[in-house]
Amino acid sequence: KQWLEIGMLLAQDPKLLLVDEPAAGMTATEREKTTAMLVNAAKTRAVVVVEHDMEFVRRLECKVTVLHEGAVLAEGRLDHVTANQDVLDVYLGR
């Protein structure tokens, strides 16, 4: 279902593609194909992915922005963001 929705969006040739949890409920193989599709789409347009699966995000190899209560908490490479103490405090409930 997600592929159909992403495909319908790409058919409209948008300058910005916003996808929410595109890998939800997918098998490992489907997640790999979705990663490739989004990486390819990002070559010709801006792609914003809202995702909680950090392994999926890691495979995208892109800049990550962590939001908390509507404000940017951290931004940068995934390894930088996941090592950020503010991010750890917020998401581990400290």
Predicted feature locations:
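Glycine-rich phosphate-binding loops of nucleotide-dependent enzymes
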Residues: 1-94
